[in-house]
């Protein structure tokens, strides 16, 4: 693989990952106590979990076309984040006894259902309303596509060296996981805590986050290229 193509693929994948993290609804500790909307965990942790699942499904398509690998990554990440949000809602509704609503909007942008009268006083919402669920699925898809693209590029580059097919796939997956974490953490710092999805005012920070991930991914791509073609492997 051409070194510039490798850097470009890693950069594009990193930007997709960083952008996708901004779509994922994360409420942190307050959400775990049903006092904020979103999944009750950290931004980087949830995004990385979805990304790792996407990398597993992308790696399962090793040897297929790049589009198939990226599609598999997207499906894996979407399933992981979708199941997480679904189970979370089941706990919020049937365990805690709260209605999935957001305090950031008066009506759900997708369903048009009123939100304000269902928000428990003293909270910022609870559960995962439809807009958060859809936003999370979009974020998972973007992250999975980005991770799959990075995996494919690294795998193609490593196959031309002394590695066998299994060795190339393993090293490519490890590299892809590292690059995924870098961009997930950068996006998490840019968000600065919790976010509900594309309807959250914090979503406006996505431009700055994408620029930061772009720079970090270019550096990561350049370092990866030096390692791959510089004799390390």
UniProtKB/Swiss-Prot annotation:
Membrane-spanning intervals of the chain: 4-24, 39-59, 67-87, 133-153, 166-186, 209-229
Pfam families reported for this sequence: MtrD
InterPro entries on file: MeTrfase_D (IPR005779)
Enzyme Commission number, as recorded: 7.2.1.4
Enzyme class: translocase
Protein family (similarity comment): Belongs to the MtrD family.
NCBIfam families tied to this protein: mtrD (TIGR01112)
UniProt-recorded name of the protein: Tetrahydromethanopterin S-methyltransferase subunit D
Species: Methanothermobacter marburgensis (strain ATCC BAA-927 / DSM 2133 / JCM 14651 / NBRC 100331 / OCM 82 / Marburg)
GN (gene name): mtrD
């Amino acid at each position: 693989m051409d070194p510039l193509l490798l850097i470009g693929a890693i950069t594009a994948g990193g930007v997709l990952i960083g952008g996708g993290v901004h779509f994922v609804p994360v409420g942190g500790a307050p959400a775990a106590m049903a006092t904020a909307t979103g999944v009750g965990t950290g931004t980087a942790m949830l995004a990385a979990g979805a990304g790792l699942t996407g990398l597993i499904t992308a790696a399962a398509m090793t040897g297929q076309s790049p589009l198939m690998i990226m599609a598999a990554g997207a499906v894996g990440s979407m399933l992981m984040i979708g199941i997480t949000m679904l189970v979370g809602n089941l706990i919020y509704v049937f365990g805690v006894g709260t209605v999935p609503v957001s305090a950031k909007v008066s009506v759900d942008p997708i369903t048009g259902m009123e939100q304000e009268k269902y928000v428990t006083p003293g909270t910022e919402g609870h559960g995962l309303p439809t807009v958060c669920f859809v936003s999370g699925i979009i974020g998972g898809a973007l992250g999975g596509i980005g991770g799959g693209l990075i995996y494919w590029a690294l795998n193609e580059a490593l196959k031309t060296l002394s590695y066998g097919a299994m060795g190339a796939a393993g090293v490519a997956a490890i590299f892809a996981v590292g690059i995924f974490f870098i961009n997930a953490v950068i996006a998490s710092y840019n968000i600065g805590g919790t976010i509900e999805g594309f309807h959250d005012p914090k979503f406006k920070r996505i431009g700055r986050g994408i620029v930061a991930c772009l720079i970090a991914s270019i550096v990561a791509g350049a370092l990866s290229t030096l390692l791959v073609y510089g004799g390390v492997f």
